[in-house]
Amino acid sequence: LFDDTVYKNITIGRPGASLDEVVDAAKAADAHAFITAMPQGYETALGERGVKLSGGQRQRLAIARAIIKKPKILLLDEATSNLDTGSEQSVQAAIERILGGRTVIMVAHRLSTVKNADKIFVLKKGGLAETGTHEELLKLGGVYKGLYEAQT
């Protein structure tokens, strides 16, 4: 995040977006409630001289930024890493809401993040080990199943 307002942090990829568009993106990213609880809402300063955000709040602002940009391809790299369970669930719900109508590439060690993906590619030692849906990979009984069972 940048040392600027919440509004400007969300619109960095699409300057000039209306407040209504920013609010819609924040709602889809499950960020609107914590933003409106801040002293100046969307005009609250963030960063060194402003409000400090939790990891989950930062992730949800990043998701709002992606939503407002409306990319055809979205890359999410460890979107739920280092989050507590509540924040992880909130970020996962936000991700689920923005998946439709675009190609999303997710890099994740937490398999719960990719469980609903159309296709999962499992890498091991720098190579492709398995590919399939969550259900197909569990039935296969290989690397993915072992990792999934270790995490649940």
Identify the residue ranges that each predicted region occupies.
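Short beta-loop-alpha junction of Rossmann-like oxidoreductase domains
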Residues: F34
